[in-house]
Amino acid sequence: MPNGPAAERENGAHDPTAGAAMSTAPATNIVWHHSTVTRAARAHQRGHRSAILWFTGLSGAGKSTLANAVNSALFEQGLACYVLDGDNVRHGLCNDLGFSDADREENIRRIGEVAKLFLDAGVVVLTAFVSPFRADRARARALVETGDFIEIFCAADLDVCEQRDTKGLYARARAGEIRDFTGISSPYEEPEAPELRVETGRQSLEESVGQVMAHLETRGIIPPPGEG
């Protein structure tokens, strides 16, 4: 998983003054313009469906590592895919957000909307975010049709995640140096019924990738290798 300044931003070591005030008034007089190229047409051309793969779990559970490995496997098969990473989006799209509950909610709201655009563009989009709250994940799921959102719980015990933390972020959180750190000073709500539970704390990366790829094939999102 990423460490250093980017990882600290993902998990709460963030300037508490970040986040400028925004207007709460919604835009008016806007109309949705439908594309002349449909999602179905893109799927037909590319030979695979689009989907949102939502990787969630504690910091250090292996979300980004697994998402990027699955992304590579999809790419090697010639499939359209892209990773939205929790650290990366805070460099741009969400660099005005901190780690309060409200900011976390807004962070996931934005990612859900971006993922929906990728879905319409015919891409298998892999999102790797702690996304600690069930309600926020449920809102992201509700943006799309049933079957388009695949929640993948990267399950790893807290002690395993701490052992993987070479930069000592968990230790700093326990010492009170990092505020709102998920799993220590901020809660993580495990998925109650994820489409897929991957034991990233126990099995190898290769096994985890194989589990995800097999699930996508079973659901008819991607073709078996050699049939694309």
Q: What label would you give each PLM region?
A:
Residues 155-158, 163-211, 218-228:
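Small-molecule kinase domains that catalyze NTP-dependent phosphoryl transfer to phosphate-bearing small molecules
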Residues 63:
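Conserved lysine of the Walker
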Residues 83, 149-151, 195-197:
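Conserved beta-strand scaffold positions in the cores of enzyme catalytic domains, especially
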Residues 92-99, 113-174, 180:
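ATP-dependent NMP and nucleoside kinases share a basic, alpha-helical "lid"
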Residues 59:
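The conserved Walker
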Residues 2-4, 8-52:
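Extreme N-terminal, non-catalytic leader segments
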Residues 55:
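Hydrophobic anchor at the beta1->P-loop junction of P-loop NTPases
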Residues 68-116, 120:
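Conserved substrate/cofactor phosphate-moiety recognition/catalytic segment
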